[in-house]
Amino acid sequence: MGLRATSLHALRLAGLLAGLWAGNAAAISGNEQVSLAGTGQFEQLVSALEKQAASEPMKVADWHALCYSYFRIKRYDKIFSCLDQLDKALVARDKRTRLFGLDDATPTSLLMRAETFVEIAQYSAAIDQAQRAIDWYTKDGESEKDILAQALAVQAIAYKNLGKPDLAQQAAQKLEATQVNAYTDLAIGAKSLALARVNMALGRWQKALDALASDKTLGLRAFVDNITSGAFLKGLNNWVWLELPRGYMQTKAQFELGDIDRARAGFDKLLDVPQLAANGEIYWMVLSDRALIASKDGDDAKAIAFYRKALDVIERQRASINTEANKIGFIGDKQDVYARLVALLFKTSKFSDAFEVIERAKSRALVDLLASKSSFAPPRAAREEKLDIVEILGQQGRYDAALGQQSEAVLRSFAGGNAPRENTLKLALPAELQSLVSVSALTEAEIQKLLSPDEALLSYFANGNSMYAMVITKDSTFGTAINAEGLENDVRRLRASLAKRLPVETQLKQLHTRLLAPVESQIKQRRLSIVAHGALHYLPFAALFDGQQYLAEKYSLRMLPSASVLKYLRPARTNDFKAVLMMGNPDLKNPAMDLPGAQLEAQALAKDLAGSKLLLRADASRKAFIEFAPQSQLVHVASHGEFDATNALSSGLLLAPDGATPGRLTVSDVYQLALDAEMVTLSACETGLGRIASGDDVVSFTRGFLYAGTSSVMASLWQVDDDSTTFMMTRFYQHLRTMGRGEALRNAQADTRAKFAHPYFWASFYLTGAY
């Protein structure tokens, strides 16, 4: 069954494959449902049950089977609404299920919600749902200790991921104290797996092994089930779905404990199991760990091959957020696979290959960010072709899931009956949308074709204490490793010094020495596009200082979320803006949040820019933005901004509310807009000085406006003094009349620097998108 089944009801696998309850015939019979689920064909089960739901009433057992199938294939767009239907059915109908042969589906609904919340990093909600399952156990199901074990495991893992180790430890102790008889209690298997998951999450590898070993009757139960279900006579093993995650956890623990020989043999044995390929999350982790061992063995070629295969498995799946990995408590970081492969490719001087993997990693990060989002505004090409973007996203997700299950029949059904092709659905998407829903990084050669002769691209890729910098020009590629130890703290200290307007020249010079000096000899061009990564998203590159000049004095700069976005940027058509939306100092119903300087800024700029629609205070609302921004060539917003490092799509601009409707314009909202703006300027926004996170929040906000149809976005890394901001914005728009956007920003920064010398005043603004 795979990791999900073991997470919910490991000891009821026999009930899944052999135990059916008597009931009336359905559109798809109970036997067929059990057979499809037991063989992992969840896409086919979903298809059949969705047709049934559209044509006739569904029993609790049917809703449970459908929800569980969504749960298995990561249909985040449908799982919660399905569970809502299941909960409604549970109020008035027979509560029994076919899958797992449960008398009451209530706790499984709660646990599926809890597990899904963990997957999408909503840990507080996961803890709440798990507690409701515990409450159900206390009230109605004290014999159902597997429910208690799984709920406590969810809480322990969620608390750990929330950074609350004491509460995680408390949940782990409650789980460990749960009394089960090692030889007679059917919940021993559930407790064993739950303890193993928790101990892996907490990095307690020996305890994870001990937990797995505590289930002393697994072999006997598997043998009995294979006999009673008839699998033995067919040469099948129903329990391979339980044995795979147990085998992975055991081998992973051995590896982490330094037993490399046993781990190597264990991973090789797992790779020989045909069903492993149908469990994508475990599959990529096995491949990644096997690559690590090959690397330790000194076999770089084999390690590279394993890593490439792991990436193929990862990228075949629809974007997901730590799916199976959370279920065993070990957060298998997909980005580590990219980073380790990049390190090996650098080691073997395969810089072109390394660059492409770096681009795939950054593309994947964006896919993961958008994984749980199902509503997008069509990009320009899609609007013209009248494509149903949400439906295409759903088709792409189902197709990717089918690929992950390795089911030829399902693949053929999505490929129109022909042999499956990975790009069948992807080819139906506009290029702009392809970059959002699939890993479609450009190659080095494709990037070089997009660069102008006077432009260089500088791309960084960070992972832990390792960092790699690559310079790509029209006709050359250069790469080098950089020591990133302490870099995040250096950026944090710089930001703190900037906020206090302390002397920063020494810090800026040190950062220049670390980040630019190793590559600057390769940069002969005047224009420089920088692709930051990690903490570097919060670094004001314009202010880096070589002892003589700031970087902004030497180059016309722009920031890009990835090099591959070059293909999708809309070129600047004009800087002579005829329709301007100017919003400033929205009334947030809190005097402490007023920005009188932003209001003066908006008023001054509106006078200088013909055709401006000026909206201030209560008029500067979210509703007004959504109404007027699509009609504007230039959108300038001078307001507060809040960036959520834990949930980038919730980051937003604080605009005036409309009655009871909040005024927050989120990144998620931006992805649903249909703009045709030449430029969006976000003035007075701040990411929060001193806070360094993954950087995805900064990327996602600017990329959201690019996706919505904006050619260029100018934003700030921190809130700046009112006078200097107004001065700089005025100079920027004046320079735009005679030069490109990158040069206009560079010259506006120079003008501001002459009047306000400290980098705090002039270095916060950066350009993304078209020059």
Which ranges hold each PLM region?
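Amphipathic alpha-helical protein-protein interaction segments
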Residues: A190, W239-P245, D268, W284-M285, ...
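"A position-specific structural signal for the A-helix of alpha-solenoid helical repeats
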Residues: N31, A65, A105, M112, ...
